[in-house]
From Swiss-Prot:
One GO location term (cellular component): cytoplasm
Pathway per the UniProt entry: Amino-acid biosynthesis; L-arginine biosynthesis; L-arginine from L-ornithine and carbamoyl phosphate: step 2/3
Protein name: Argininosuccinate synthase
Source organism of this protein record: Lawsonia intracellularis (strain PHE/MN1-00)
InterPro entries: Arginosuc_syn_C, Arginosuc_syn_N, Arginosuc_synth, Arginosuc_synth_CS, Arginosuc_synth_type_1_subfam, AS_cat/multimer_dom_body, Rossmann-like_a/b/a_fold
Amino acid sequence: MSNRIKKVVLAYSGGLDTSVILKWLIATYNCEVIAVTADLGQNENFHDIEEKAIVTGASKAYVVDLRNEFAKNFIFPMLRASAIYEGRYLLGTAIARPLITKLLIDIARAEEADAIAHGATGKGNDQVRFELAAAALAPDIHVIAPWREWDLISRTALTTFAEKHNIPISTSHKRYSKDQNMLHCSIEGSELENPWEEPHIESYTMTVPIEHTPDSPEYITIDFEKGDPIAINGQQMIPADIMFTLNDIAGRHGIGRIDMVESRFLGIKSRGVYETPGGTIIHIAHQDLEGITLDHMTLLTRNQLIPSYADAIYNGFWFSPEREAIQAFMDKAQERVTGTVKLKLYKGMAYPIGRKSSNSLYSSQLATFEEDTSYNHNDATGFIKLKSLRIRGYQKS
């Protein structure tokens, strides 16, 4: 295999793992390596990352701004579908992997590369996500997964390799391993490997501790068009700016923290500590607007499809017929979800306190408990009698 592979496109973060992988690929496969970094809104110094890739041995280093594409074509479709994994996780890491893989494939095609490579470990979900996406997009391109090939199985071994090959590494010890983009930040390591231990205050990046949040609530409005957020407090923005603005607003109120034990696709239980400030507000506001614009059966069908849709994303099947079919239903249902939601933000919570829509199904005349002329109470008698036919006598003693 190594004789056949001459050029590899590597998903590169600039950290210890992918820097070691870059040098390892050159040494093991005697190949050219092109480093690719996707800007998905993470707080990184991309100039330094690009420079480090070249110093470490990459023939080229790409840094590609995918922020608006990520928000518009990946985050927003997922939020339109109200996707949530195991009832809690808003899929911030999982949704980024298909876009990163697509970028790797596009550059591999342009550079006539033989393979792509990633730095996902052999225990996690990301290896599956990268490789399933690659299989769907470019089954002819080989995927190299160094963590499943090499014998560098510890942080000490990686550091020793880096020092031996003069790879620049940070001397400061990082307590946590973090993966961040414009939708969320995931935190792993240290005391978090014990599911009983509370996360340390320094583990969080995007949200303020509840103890330090404002003592007065903040009120905001979010405008939606066909299920997508388009404006905050009446100001229209592009999708990426919607995410950044809501992250700032929600983050200062400590909104969007999740601490859970989840089921990995490989069958392993793992602890997930996540921050999803802006995404949490959108998720809450969007579902609230659906309540006034969608009928019961559409909502029921949507709710039945959410677990399958979320599983598809979590397990790496973004580019799959089932995900696309469910997306088609979700997007059809969202044609009515246009309007405005008013929220009260306070001490880690986002409360919808008002909603309006030109497609509203709410009728104050029908809903009122006061006297009205549009509803005949006697009509309920026949309705109840018909609905009782199926269960009449079911519990008869």
